[in-house]
Amino acid sequence: MGLILAIVALALLLPWAAAPAARRLALLLPPREASLALTGGAVLLAGGTVAALVGLFHVPFLAGLEHLPLSGVVARWPAVVPVSCAAGAALAVQAVRLTLRWRGHRVLLARAWGLTADATSDGDLLVVAGEEAEAFALPGHRGRPGRVVVSTGMLRALGPEERAVLLAHERAHLRGRHHLLSAAADLSAAVHPALARLRVDLDYHLERWADEQAAAAVTDRRTAATAIARAALAGSPPARRGAGPLLSVNTGPVPQRVRALLGPEPARPTGRRAHAAVALVAAVTLAALLGAALAYGLHEYVEYAARALRDHGTV
């Protein structure tokens, strides 16, 4: 039983080591690649965590499949039942957290669509009457395509060129389906606490991705930087910053985003940065795959141990 617990402990501790590596990797990559790396790492690490707990939870059931009496297994491994129950409790907590968070996403999305019922439509743009300066990408819902939602207060706060940047930014969110990446990372954070910081970092890189696409659309990085800054200053902070399907122009560290836009266009890493990026990619991928391999190895080890006990007649 000691080896089984060691395998599970290693699988559960891996995200604490892999998450910082994923965050460092994201800083070396352009926004698009950084967003994909963070999302993929979060999902893989969360999956490894769930797989390890499932493997630990069904140890007594494997004994039953091998036609071993549970009393004999408990006599051999006294901790098997309480440890399995603890794993089951952890899985139940994860299931509740995932359900509540997913339901929260759906409720927020439905509520946002409800608030646009009286909006003026112009193609993919919905203009909502209101003094508050608001702008966000509204994903599709129940067969309705995604829309860019902007308040009249936000439109009045920006000049024509700045409005073009704002609309290009929000359209980039819709076109890239960034809400799916954000939701995947948010749900992964509900599985393992070490992944919560990845979701926060992902918010920044998704906004940087949209910022760069907006700058390319207007072909003027300084205008894009000015527009992002003015829109963020005019708008109110999002109620649930980065924790749902609505991505807003004032999400994330705006000063850092503006400084990035005032600098050169992001490029793929070269030289030492490229070597560091490759090393970090390998480390994060290895950690995620190791978590899955540990979960599979746990299953195989339990089956082997059960067969050995049966063959030697110890249970």
Model-derived segments and their meaning:
Residues 30-44:
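Loop-to-helix transition at the N-terminal end of transmembrane alpha-helices
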Residues 2-4, 11, 80-105, 233-315:
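Cytosolic-facing loops and C-terminal tails of multi-pass membrane proteins
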Residues 6-26:
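N-terminal signal-anchor/start-transfer transmembrane helix
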Residues 22-34, 83, 87, 95-182, ...:
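Polar-ligand-bearing catalytic/cofactor-coordination segments
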Residues 40, 187, 227-231:
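Short acidic/histidine-centered micro-motifs embedded in hydrophobic/aromatic stretches
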Residues 40-50, 279-280:
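Select subsegments of transmembrane alpha-helices in polytopic membrane proteins
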Residues 29-33, 66-70, 110-114, 302-311:
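Juxtamembrane extracytosolic/periplasmic "stalk" immediately C-terminal to the first targeting helix
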Residues 47-111:
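Transmembrane alpha-helices and immediately adjacent membrane-cytoplasm interface residues
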